[in-house]
Amino acid sequence: LSLTSFDKEFELNGLAAESWLQSDDGLTWTFNLRDDLKWSDGETLKASDYIFALQRAATTGYDFGWYWSFAGGLKNWGPVTDGSMDVDQLGIKAVDDKTIEVTTETVKPYLPSVVSLWYPVPEHAWKKHGDEYAANVETMVASGPFMLESWEKSTNKMVLVKNPNYNAP
């Protein structure tokens, strides 16, 4: 469940984020998450799940890294991804369970559209199953309107069902 999304008229709307504000200097954005966001396993979706996702992307050779450097302009993305700076110095933080703060290197007035491609990773599932958390039906956890019911890997057939814990727009 991304923070924002575009509707059929190409208007930007909140998805996981119910609101966002840009600081006076233009370098810091605060995103406020909707109440009662849940993973498909019933666990609460937290701001820290978004932070965990980008921290993993920054430290695991993520192929889409240029997006967060160029379009997103995240503070310290380059030094963190090249290993010369600790991932905790990346310009993202969970202020609390419902608040994400993003700091950029330069003013990015379009950042709310950039975060339409920022998806969380269920840190609780990853801690329990490692990278296998998304490798099979029994351990896969989703945040969107659907979840995996079955997966025939030999034929690449997946059956999706409604996620009963999905309550975003």
Name each model-derived stretch.
Residues 15-17, 24-28, 87, 95-99, ...:
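Extracytoplasmic
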Residues 104-169:
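Gly/Pro-rich hinge or "lid" segments in bacterial periplasmic/extracellular proteins
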Residues 29-32, 159-161:
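Structural recognition of the beta-strand scaffold that forms the well-ordered cores
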Residues 32, 49-51, 58-125, 152:
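Surface-exposed binding/hinge segments that line
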Residues 17, 47, 51-55, 89, ...:
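Extracytoplasmic/secreted envelope proteins and their assembly/folding machinery
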Residues 37:
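Short basic (Lys/Arg) and small-residue
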Residues 1-24, 55, 141:
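N-terminal lobe/hinge region of extracytoplasmic solute-binding protein
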